[in-house]
Amino acid sequence: VNSRSVPVGNRRPLLGAVAELVNATNAFTPLTRHGYPAIGVFAFGWPTSENAPLVIAGSALGALRRALRGEYRSTSGRISLLLKVVSWVLLAVVHRRAVTSRPYFEDPLSEVLGPQFPPIPPRPGGVWATGRTRRRFVEKTVRYGPYRSNVADIWVRTDLPKDAKAPVLLQVPGGAWMIGMNRPQAYPLMSQLADHGWICVSIGYRISPKHAWPAHIVDVKRALAWVKANIGAYGGDPDAVYITGGSAGGHLSSLAALTPNDPAYQPGFEDADTSVAGAVPIYGRYDWITEGFPERRQFGSVLERLIVKLPFTDNRQLYLDASPITHVGPEAPPFFVLHGTHDTLIPVEEAREFVEKLRAVSQAPVIYAEIPYAQHAFDVFGSARGHYTASAVERFLDWARATRPE
């Protein structure tokens, strides 16, 4: 089509259709995984890949409106409609990949836990369950430490007895160690667990660049200490505390699980118990030191400039100590690690290396679910993968609780 021969107003449907096709293609397979453009690839690909039916519906309604106005009668109009149809086909494939991904969550659990455990239930509600997340269980927000960001939402059923001795899950939010937004992360997981009798504690913590490392992990440890000392008043069991988190929260939750009671990360509360009975890091960062591929070198520069604020060459031990992969050992608690193959923010190789090293030394089970075609943050929405993640994590946690030594 010769753009000079098409009036600007008539080009809008074509330009919009091209944009939709690029977006659908990016959801189908990331346009790039390298450099800062990968952030934009995630920003558009993530919501599209997890909410594909809604994107199709919105596009189809727009196409219907334009058709009623006769905008598809011209050559450029017909081309734009064709591009839209191609986008819908790609998005339909994206959605099918998501709704058929249950075995990738379930099979790793069955291999380790055995077939006697109930399977992950089919996703309820059909495609229109996409995006349904609820905060129905937050009884109150508490302060667990002296800093402004040291707050936590307590997710608990209002009818839970105060002597229930319910298991507890501490949720550590992600955000590149620079965005301390615990809402609305892990809502599908926490609402499901709370509904089934768990207590969930979703925390905030100090973030960079205002605060330098290790303030972040110190706050996570402080939150664990608070939970151990106070959760009994809400009906929780301080001896059955588990931890999870995604992205930076995956890093912090795994580091906390692998460094129980480490005084270096517990200034002023060195004697507090910060051990956990199990960990579920999701699309986390586990290595702050190895430069095995270009993406890690770029990540290292971000650490030096914004998070640690100290050069790696002069502070190698600090970066080593901040890497969960450094702390793997035989005493590690049970782990359930999840990661998507289409993650453009943290490569899936990060999880593979961590799991390999942890399995080589840990005496406890290490379960790894690698989810094909899943972007970063695939569990945030109430999508198919959000449901499968919540059900798989609950199944793992119930097993860890049932087999926990008394």
Q: Model regions: which residues?
A:
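Alpha/beta-hydrolase superfamily serine-hydrolase fold, recognizing
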Residues: 2-406
